[in-house]
Curated annotation (Swiss-Prot):
InterPro entries: SPATA45 (IPR038806). Belongs to the SPATA45 family. The gene is SPATA45. This is Spermatogenesis-associated protein 45. It comes from Homo sapiens (Human). It comes from the Eukaryota.
């Protein structure tokens, strides 16, 4: 509980958000050692083969923004009643005794 109170005190003192504080802590903790990222480390070679971004630094990565839809009808807002479904066949009578 004391660590939570300390975190809240630090956030209030510096006026930063929790996300920013976590990023700062992770930057201090992350190893930027080139030996760990090289292909010559055989300790985790199997995992690295399956996960190509295994040694990618998370402090410098950003999330990709979604690309806006640029399709043929992206410029118009379609309402649900604009294109009603046409019935090409008469409705069936599925009653058992009909």
């Amino acid at each position: 509980m004391a660590s939570i109170n300390r975190t809240i005190e630090i956030m209030k003192k510096h006026g930063v958000s929790k996300q920013h504080l976590l990023e700062e802590i992770n930057k201090k903790r992350e190893s930027n050692c080139l030996v760990e990222r090289s292909n010559q480390v055989s300790l985790l070679r199997v995992q690295k083969r399956h996960f190509p971004d295994a040694y990618q630094s998370f402090t410098d990565t950003t999330t990709k923004e979604p690309v806006p839809n640029s399709g043929r009808s992206s410029w118009i807002k379609l309402s649900l009643l604009a294109h009603m479904e046409r019935k090409h066949f008469p409705p069936k009578n599925n009653a058992i005794f009909g």
